[in-house]
């Protein structure tokens, strides 16, 4: 949990630094990954986490670099997942007054994955998401993470429910 707090503090500090440089564009979200593999569920049914999108003011197509951290279990039975992705978010508008609309997105890249009985391994995969923009830069999204293989029966595949804010 301490690492989760450190990641959130890093994200908030990055927001301040980017704002001072005249750059905008961080999306910070908190939530939990709910793994689909039986081995991962046995260690931690929910893995709290944070994800940060670094948006470039030069990217007109919504491309971002995404870094995340999810952790579940404790002691020797801890599972850690660190997604490092190239992501893209596609906006849409809403017919409902007061809502910013639905959006979709995808990401592809590496998952650094640490499981009981194993050192950190690199798995290749990606995620797909659908989200809802709310007033004030707030948003909620559902993501599905998928990698092509597992490590000792553990896998970071599963659904993540996130809530966040765009700065």
Regions found by a protein language model. Name each.
Residues 1-25:
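Cleavable N-terminal export/targeting peptides
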Residues 33, 70, 145:
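Active-site beta-loop-alpha junctions enriched in small/polar residues
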Residues 121-167:
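A generic hydrophobic-segment detector
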Residues 37-47, 72-80, 114-121, 148-156:
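Solvent-exposed loop/turn segments connecting transmembrane beta-strands
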Residues 9, 13, 21, 33-34, ...:
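Short stretches within intrinsically disordered, low-complexity N-terminal or propeptide regions
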Residues 20-34, 102-108:
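Transmembrane beta-strand segments of Gram-negative outer membrane beta-barrel proteins
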Residues 50-118, 136, 142, 159-167:
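Gram-negative (and chloroplast) outer-membrane scaffold detector with strong preference
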Residues 30-60:
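N-terminal targeting signals for Sec/Tat export/insertion, comprising classic cleavable signal peptides
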């Amino acid at each position: 949990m301490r690492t989760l707090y450190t990641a959130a503090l890093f994200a908030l500090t990055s927001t301040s630094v980017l704002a001072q440089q005249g750059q905008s564009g961080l999306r910070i979200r908190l939530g939990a990954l709910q793994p689909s593999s039986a081995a991962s569920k046995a260690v931690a049914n929910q893995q709290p986490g944070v994800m940060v999108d670094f948006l470039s003011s030069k990217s007109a197509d919504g491309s971002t670099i995404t870094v995340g951290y999810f952790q579940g279990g404790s002691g020797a039975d801890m599972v850690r997942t660190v997604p490092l992705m190239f992501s893209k978010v596609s906006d849409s508008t809403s017919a409902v007054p007061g809502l910013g609309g639905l959006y979709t997105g995808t990401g592809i890249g590496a998952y650094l994955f640490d499981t009981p009985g194993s050192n950190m391994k690199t798995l290749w995969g990606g995620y797909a998401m659908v989200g809802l923009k709310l007033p004030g830069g707030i948003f909620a999204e559902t993501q599905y993470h998928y990698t092509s293989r597992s490590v000792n029966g553990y896998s970071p595949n599963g659904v993540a429910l996130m809530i966040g804010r765009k700065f």
